[in-house]
Amino acid sequence: MVEFCPKCNNIMLPKNGRLKCTVCGFEEELGNRTEEYELKEKIEAKKQEVTVIEDVDTLPTTRIECPSCGNMEASWWLQQTRCADEPETRFYKCKKCGHTWREYD
């Protein structure tokens, strides 16, 4: 069985009774599922270029609720994060607290 990270959608690998994301570091307890997971081969994660948006004042804004603070205004941008035949991912950054989250179409 393959598990994917709920934060960044990359594959999670079993390690010391836990599942760990190789990209963002998210961890999840395996509990009684340890026998389901056995690492057969280790494959190095592919490096991915990340665009850092620092000046959000130049980005378009929209009315959407921030899941962190409840503010109703965020800057947004699109980025191709998956295969070219799949839609772009929309990212939001709260204008009040700076929390960043993504939305898939």
Curated annotation (Swiss-Prot):
A zinc finger (C4-type) spans 5-24. Zn(2+) 2 binds at C66, C69, C94, C97. The keyword Metal-binding applies. Keywords: DNA-binding, DNA-directed RNA polymerase, Metal-binding, Transcription, Transcription regulation, Zinc, Zinc-finger. SUPFAM superfamilies: Zinc beta-ribbon. Pfam families: Zn_ribbon_RPB9, Zn_ribbon_TFIIS. A zinc finger (TFIIS-type) spans 62-102. GO terms for cellular component: DNA-directed RNA polymerase complex. One of its GO terms (molecular function) is zinc ion binding. Zn(2+) 1 binds at C5, C8, C21, C24. Induces RNA cleavage activity in the RNA polymerase. In its presence, the cleavage activity of the RNA polymerase truncates the RNA back to position +15 in a stepwise manner by releasing mainly dinucleotides from the 3'-end of the nascent RNA. The truncated RNAs are able to continue elongation. Involved in transcriptional proofreading and fidelity. Misincorporation of nucleotides during elongation of transcription leads to arrested elongation complexes which are rescued by TFS-promoted removal of a dinucleotide from the 3'-end. Belongs to the archaeal RpoM/eukaryotic RPA12/RPB9/RPC11 RNA polymerase family. This is Transcription factor S. It comes from Methanothermococcus thermolithotrophicus.
